[in-house]
């Protein structure tokens, strides 16, 4: 089936421009300004939604329309690993650069078909939301759902074009240990909070691998208080835990608390704690109903394999779901490329995603 997105040059140029704008979380100003001007230039009724600190979301909401679905992309990226690898680099079909997969490829893939329909005179019952802050607190999406409600959302996170009707849950954990500051030459085994925390981390790792192997855990940060030539007073670690949509996350949290309590009983010198900073439940949507059928039809007509999967990371979809919005993730690129040193996305996939969204929007125009 031929491409529905006629202006492939414009799509590729937009993707290149987005990658070339450095936009780590908290510093999205330049990319917001660029896209605001870009959408205004093409006569879309774009507006800024302030989220605090001079930061903003970009929204296009057709006036006098009952919105059926919102297309969501996040404009921020993680911080750069290497400043020399910031800019866009093209190797035939492969487009490299920070945010190429997560998720500037996805942003381009929803902006171009939306823009194409407007240029053709259509006013679909579809909103466009380009949000800030997804990589950290999700403050852009939190602000979005305070003011707006949509029945459905499509999020262009990297899913290798697999439609994701289900989504993993997520727990962000902090564990801490405290001790007594003393001269380094007087340190005795077992009373250093760093050692105490390492013993707890080993125990938690054993729990995850032996008792809950279905969970995906990551020890993200480990740091102690600055102490110089002395025993540090505190040590902290941050963990990410992802779990399947049906996992008993309440029971998992209790089991983790019990492990810390047991550690205290077995080691009187251990002064530690565990806290759950963020808890997002997973969800499962049935692959039926209007949007599922429309999407299946698009895949059939484009001869694409219909292989739904569960999205295995946390994302703004968790926040949309908690706000009563039904999110489906579908985008170009894969999580295996996201946040990597040589992040990349296939332009062929970006184009394919853009065609899928073009056809999906067209089907909604026909149902008005």
Question: Where in the sequence are the language-model features?
Answer:
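Hydrophobic/aromatic beta-strand patches that form the interior of the parallel beta-sheet core
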Residues: 69-71, 129, 152-154, 173, ...
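Acidic-glycine-rich active-site phosphate/pyrophosphate-binding loop
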Residues: 76-91, 165-176, 297
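Acidic/histidine-rich catalytic neighborhood of metal-dependent amide-processing enzymes
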Residues: 104, 108-172
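Secretory-pathway/membrane protein signature
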Residues: 1-13, 17, 41-43, 75, ...
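Glycine/serine-rich anion-binding loops at beta->alpha junctions
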Residues: 93-109
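Metal-dependent amide/peptide-bond hydrolase catalytic core
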Residues: 30, 158, 172-368
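A structural signal for isolated positions on well-ordered beta-strands in alpha/beta enzyme cores
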Residues: 47, 70, 127-129, 273
């Amino acid at each position: 089936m031929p491409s529905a997105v006629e202006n492939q040059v414009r799509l590729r140029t937009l993707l290149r421009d987005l990658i070339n704008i450095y936009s780590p979380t908290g510093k999205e100003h330049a990319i917001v300004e660029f896209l605001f001007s870009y959408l205004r230039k093409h006569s879309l009724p774009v507006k800024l939604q302030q989220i605090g600190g001079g930061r903003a979301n970009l929204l296009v909401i057709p006036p006098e329309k009952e919105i059926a679905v919102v297309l969501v992309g996040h404009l921020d990226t993680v911080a750069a690993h290497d400043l020399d690898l910031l800019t866009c680099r093209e190797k035939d079909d492969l487009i490299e650069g920070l945010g190429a997969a997560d998720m500037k490829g996805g942003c381009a893939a929803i902006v171009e078909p939306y823009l194409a329909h407007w240029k053709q005179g259509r006013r679909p019952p579809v909103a466009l939301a380009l949000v800030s802050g997804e990589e950290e607190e999700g403050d852009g999406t939190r602000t979005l759902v305070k003011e707006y409600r949509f029945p459905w959302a499509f999020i262009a996170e990297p899913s290798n074009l697999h439609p994701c009707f289900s989504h993993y849950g997520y727990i962000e954990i902090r564990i801490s240990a405290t001790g007594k500051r003393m001269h380094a030459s007087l340190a005795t085994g077992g009373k250093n909070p760093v050692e105490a925390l390492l013993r707890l981390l080993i125990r938690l790792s054993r729990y995850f691998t032996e008792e809950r192997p279905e969970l995906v855990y990551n020890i993200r940060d480990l740091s102690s208080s600055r102490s110089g030539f002395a025993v540090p007073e505190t040590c902290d670690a941050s963990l990410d835990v992802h779990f399947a949509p049906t996992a008993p996350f309440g029971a998992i949290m209790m089991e983790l608390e019990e492990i810390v309590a047991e550690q205290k009983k077995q080691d009187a010198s251990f002064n530690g704690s565990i806290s759950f900073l963020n808890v997002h439940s997973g969800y499962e949507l049935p692959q039926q109903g209007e949007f599922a059928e429309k999407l299946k039809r698009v895949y059939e007509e484009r001869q694409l394999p219909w292989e739904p999967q569960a999205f295995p990371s946390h994302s703004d979809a968790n926040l949309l779901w908690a706000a009563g919005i039904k999110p489906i993730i579908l985008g170009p690129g894969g999580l295996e490329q996201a946040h990597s040193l040589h992040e990349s996305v296939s332009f062929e996939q970006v184009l394919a995603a853009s065609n899928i969204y073009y056809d999906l929007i067209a089907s909604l125009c026909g149902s008005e």
